[in-house]
A protein has these predicted regions:
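Short, surface-exposed charged micro-motifs
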Residues: 4-5, 86-90
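C-terminal active-site-capping segments
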Residues: 129
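Generic secondary-structure signature for well-ordered alpha-helical cores
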Residues: 13, 71-75, 103, 132, ...
């Protein structure tokens, strides 16, 4: 039944992939996403006048926390020692877009792509949560 899907055994049961025979290597993943907040929210974020506080600072911490919790959220994701995690931003003020970049590094037998994707998504969700009361037109895009 596996037919190339390595998260299922021959009987179709979900399994965690066996990485025990793989070599330990350096792993890096970068995920990016964006949230369209518009000019008014962008200005409030830059000025620090959002009622809920430091939007980007809180979202950065939330993203890092999301990275550390990835294996608890994604069923077949291996728990990994995270050796570096950062969340950075690019503000496109003209178009009212906040871009988030989550970089994750480890030394292990499997990659950290899911951790980077989870981190950027939690970052964007936190931004949405902190500004949505102001303007419900904010929406996000993940890539």
């Amino acid at each position: 039944m596996s037919q190339g899907f390595n998260h299922f055994d021959e009987n179709g049961n979900a399994v965690m992939v066996d990485v025990s025979g793989k070599n330990v290597t350096y792993r890096t993943a970068v995920a990016t996403g964006e949230i369209h907040v518009g000019e008014a929210i962008m200005e409030a974020v830059k000025e620090g006048s959002v009622k809920k506080g430091d939007v980007l600072g809180v979202a950065r911490v939330a993203g890092i926390m999301g990275v550390k919790r990835t294996s608890e959220l994604i069923p077949m994701c291996h728990p990994l020692p995270i050796q570096k995690c950062s969340v950075d931003y690019e503000l496109d003020e003209t178009n009212g877009i906040i871009r988030a970049f989550c970089t994750v590094k480890t030394e292990g037998k499997t990659g950290v792509e899911m951790e980077a994707l989870t981190g950027v998504q939690v970052t964007l969700l936190t931004i949405y949560d902190t500004v949505s009361y102001t303007h419900l037109r904010a929406h996000e895009t993940l890539s």
